[in-house]
């Protein structure tokens, strides 16, 4: 029986872990084994890549656990957390986030509505055993969206001994009244490993150190220093099976993550003080709110034979996001929906992913890897409002990577990749807006420009990535790395075809269907000194982006009724250092 307790000024994390093994070990031998395996494994992983690598295993994740994976990693240099209220967060690497970094779990890139500033990461933080963070251009291996880096969640490794094991974890925070827990049970028998986990968290309204805020030039009161209706919860379940026998290994994972979070009504639409009065309940979730359910099924297949490693990753994801708000319309001709009248926005994203990798070790000096990826997406919409159109998206790419090891101290790596992508966007006509603009006296040219909230778009993209780097260990405890890489990113559908008021940010966001893909060059170097229990890391990087896509304020009000400033997707050269 092992008990772990970590406390802090803002929160408490308590973990109870029990492990019944068929083969018994002494405490001394177990501790020694963990130290030796962890140290050699981390050192080997750092030497395998020319990019800056951070590797975190279960002990680190437990010590810094917050109930939120991104917040757990926010103290890592170069990694930041964009917090969305008390419960959800989005990751950033070296200042890049959203669709400019990739999050991978069990070999499959996480695909949700990550373009939204108020959309969190749908991953159970309790269910993470090991995390690897690659900083820098990673499009070579991971394709588009990995310009800034990758957060890779690795699967649980078997201990190669028959055992029953389990974990019970409790989480509590004084700020926002967070309470949560997780229960995991598993069995390892011969070549099989099976694990089941259930997790749940609840948190109250968000506490702030002020009594008023300014919203749309109006002073809005904050009663009890709590942002009303910002409570939320998440409920997650997952099952994982792993099989390893001689030259073959595989795993299958099924997970479902459900999250629900309220929106502060004082910053939703036109300011209304009456909606902010204290209801004496800091945990209820009323309108407006958002909810998302993320279902994911993945499998990894791997075969080893005579210096050849063939692996495949296949996955299906269904991200169902809804935003609810009391039915309101600025058009007297728009009729309230008969079913679910308060469901404002619906996004249903289906994603099919597959990848194949072939690794060849022709000698002790040369190693080659070839790979192919494919992804198919289909997004459907619903609700009484419009923000993003329906679309279909297809991407595929192939790469080649070669590593030459001169000796045990020096290795050089280089590779190239080419991707093709196609996106088909469905048109969306808004007759209610047309009638409204006629009544307001707008010119016919303006009316026709806004008749179609989304125009039909069928575009194809192609681009390449490349990378070259060196890893040098001149002496024990010293590690030097340098890498130069070119990466790219296909424009997102929100950048091409969004056209509506997004209540999460309360601005009119309008896409541009003529945008081309982003390209970027990045050079980074690092030096690591490891001496006994001390480790010193010095790293630097410089980035240059061509056709960097961003939301540009137009300096004019939207023609949509009761809207706000208009922001349009635009592209420009930019440099980050």
Across the structure, where does each feature detected by a protein language model lie?
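Outer-membrane beta-barrel translocator/receptor signature
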Residues: 112-114, 127-129, 140-210, 231-235, ...
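Transmembrane beta-barrel wall of Gram-negative outer-membrane proteins
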Residues: 176-202, 215-264, 293-295, 299-305, ...
């Amino acid at each position: 029986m092992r008990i772990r307790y970590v406390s802090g000024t803002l929160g408490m994390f308590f973990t109870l872990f029990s492990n019944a093994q068929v083969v018994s070990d002494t405490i001394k031998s177990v501790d020694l084994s963990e130290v030796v395996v962890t140290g050699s494994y981390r050192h080997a992983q750092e030497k395998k890549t020319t990019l800056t690598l951070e590797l975190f295993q279960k002990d680190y994740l437990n010590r810094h656990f917050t109930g939120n994976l991104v917040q757990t990693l926010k103290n890592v240099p170069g990694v930041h957390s964009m917090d969305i209220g008390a419960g959800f967060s989005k990751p950033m690497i070296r200042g890049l986030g959203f669709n400019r970094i990739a999050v991978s779990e069990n070999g499959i890139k996480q695909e949700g509505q990550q373009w939204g500033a108020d959309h969190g990461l749908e991953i159970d933080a309790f269910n993470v055993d090991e995390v690897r963070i690659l900083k820098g251009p990673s499009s070579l291996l991971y394709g588009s969206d990995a310009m800034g880096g990758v957060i890779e969640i690795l699967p649980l490794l078997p201990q190669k001994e028959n055992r029953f094991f389990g974990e019970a974890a409790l989480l509590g925070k004084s700020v926002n009244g967070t309470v949560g827990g997780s229960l995991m049970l598993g069995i390892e028998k011969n070549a099989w490993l099976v694990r089941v986990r259930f997790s749940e968290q609840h948190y109250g309204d968000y506490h702030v150190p002020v009594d008023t805020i300014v919203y749309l030039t109006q002073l809005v009161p904050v009663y009890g220093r709590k942002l009303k209706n910002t409570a939320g919860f998440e409920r997650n379940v997952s099952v994982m099976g792993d099989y390893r026998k001689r030259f073959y290994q595989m795993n299958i994972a099924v997970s479902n993550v459900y999250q629900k979070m309220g929106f502060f009504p004082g910053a939703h639409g036109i300011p209304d003080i009456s909606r902010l009065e204290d209801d004496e309940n800091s945990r209820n979730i009323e309108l407006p709110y958002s909810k998302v359910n993320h279902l994911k099924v993945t499998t990894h297949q791997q075969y080893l034979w005579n210096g050849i490693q063939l692996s495949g990753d296949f996955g299906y994801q269904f991200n169902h996001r809804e935003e609810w708000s009391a039915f309101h319309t600025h058009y007297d001709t728009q009729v309230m929906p008969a079913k679910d009248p308060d469901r404002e926005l619906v996004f249903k994203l289906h994603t099919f992913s597959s990848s194949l990798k072939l690794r060849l070790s022709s000698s002790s000096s040369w190693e080659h890897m070839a790979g192919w990826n494919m992804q198919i997406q289909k997004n459907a919409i619903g609700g009484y409002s419009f923000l993003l159109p329906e679309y279909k998206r297809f991407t595929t790419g192939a790469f080649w990577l070669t590593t030459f090891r001169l000796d045990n101290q020096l290795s050089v790596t280089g590779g190239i990749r080419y991707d093709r992508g196609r996106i088909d966007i469905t048109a969306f006509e808004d007759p209610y807006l047309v009638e409204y603009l006629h009544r307001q006296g707008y010119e016919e040219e303006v009316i026709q420009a806004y008749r179609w909230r989304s125009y039909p778009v069928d575009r194809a993209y192609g681009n390449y990535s490349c990378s070259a780097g060196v890893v040098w260990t001149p002496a024990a405890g010293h590690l030097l790395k340098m890498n130069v890489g070119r990466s790219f990113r296909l424009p997102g559908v929100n950048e091409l075809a969004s056209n509506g008021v997004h209540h999460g940010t309360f601005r009119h966001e309008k896409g541009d269907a003529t945008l081309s893909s982003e390209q970027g060059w990045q050079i980074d170097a690092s030096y690591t000194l490891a001496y006994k229990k001390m480790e010193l890391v010095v790293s630097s990087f410089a980035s240059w982006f061509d056709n960097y896509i961003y939301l540009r304020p137009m300096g004019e009000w939207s023609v949509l009724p009761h809207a706000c400033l208009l922001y349009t997707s635009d592209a420009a050269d930019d440099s980050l250092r």
